[in-house]
């Protein structure tokens, strides 16, 4: 009887500490970010990651400056280098300050009459750590529209992703997230930062 009880306890103990077959392996599998599409992307994107002004122009904008940054990963959680990242959003007045790509859209959501230097769009390329960042401004918020930005990531080896970034307090982070050019961002500036790690479908490497 004692031998039976001892064997039962051993099997019960092993069962407690055994890994479940359904336990998610977070070491080599990341949850793919879902697509959320937006109809208001610009006809022409600005070729800089600073949405506050065009290249070579002085900045003159009305609103709070923010930093949007994070990492791009493939579905095996490997950082994706040399991915093209496109960002577009409204300004503090709630309108897109550019000409839209699509013609059948609500034209009331766009404006070309503004003395602000805010461009509303930009492009970044991820570094070898998969990191990206944009200098932007806090967009307009109302009962109908939450503060958000739209983003699209393209890479020749991965499925293109387009989604929406929720610029709420839950996604705020410190300045330790990613590498930022110290020339553009002074260390003493208390700029609100929002971090987003995005996962694309596919793999960039054949072997790990």
From Swiss-Prot:
InterPro entries listed in its UniProt record: Intradiol_dOase_C, Intradiol_dOase_core, Intradiol_RC_Dioxygenase
Gene3D superfamilies per UniProt: Aromatic compound dioxygenase (2.60.130.10)
Keywords in alphabetical order: Dioxygenase, Oxidoreductase
EC number: 1.13.11.-
SUPFAM superfamilies tied to this protein: Aromatic compound dioxygenase
Molecular function per GO: ferric iron binding; oxidoreductase activity, acting on single donors with incorporation of molecular oxygen, incorporation of two atoms of oxygen
Keyword Oxidoreductase: yes
Annotated family: Belongs to the intradiol ring-cleavage dioxygenase family.
Record protein name field: Putative dioxygenase RF_0617
Source organism of the structure: Rickettsia felis (strain ATCC VR-1525 / URRWXCal2) (Rickettsia azadi)
